[in-house]
Amino acid sequence: MSEENTTNNEAAAAEGKAPAGFGIKRVFTKDLSFEVPAGLGAFSLQGQPNVGQDLNTQINRVDDTHYEVVLKVTVTVKMGEDKVAFLAEVHQAGIFQVVGIEGPQLQQVLSTACPQILFPYVRETIDSLAVRGGFAPVLLPQINFDALFVQAVAQAKAQADSQAEADA
């Protein structure tokens, strides 16, 4: 693998292009929210906790080689059927430098590698918020961002194909 990278970088240098590279410039919490809608009543709720998780990624181009990637995760913990114990929302962001990667490969790096780097920060923040809020720790499961990306690409292709058929 390292021979392949070296060969690709040497070829890029011979063509006058910068060698392919990826780096983290900064990781930061962009937005944070913790809510206990039931107030004090949340601590007397009965039932089995049900943890719901919603996530999405936002990609913003900063300049020619830098991108801001924001991983937005909302965790809602309900007791029983519909009684919300608490809601935590974290927007974890990173500034990433990407050089020599373009097109679909760039989109894949920004949609998979960057969120994979940011997710441990989100997990720790949500767990800490829950504990500091007086609740049991919340241990979010690991997420396969590669599989989510493949699924999103397949859905977009299927949607484009069905739109093309409808237009024909």
UniProtKB/Swiss-Prot annotation:
The keyword DNA repair does not apply. Signal peptide: none annotated. Keywords: Chaperone, Cytoplasm, Protein transport, Translocation, Transport. InterPro entries: SecB (IPR003708), SecB-like_sf (IPR035958). It is found in: Cytoplasm. GO terms for cellular component: cytoplasm. The keyword Cytoplasm applies. One of its GO terms (biological process) is protein transport. SUPFAM superfamilies: SecB-like. One of its GO terms (molecular function) is unfolded protein binding. HAMAP family: SecB. Homotetramer, a dimer of dimers. One homotetramer interacts with 1 SecA dimer. NCBIfam families: secB. One of the proteins required for the normal export of preproteins out of the cell cytoplasm. It is a molecular chaperone that binds to a subset of precursor proteins, maintaining them in a translocation-competent state. It also specifically binds to its receptor SecA. Belongs to the SecB family. This is Protein-export protein SecB. It comes from Saccharophagus degradans (strain 2-40 / ATCC 43961 / DSM 17024).
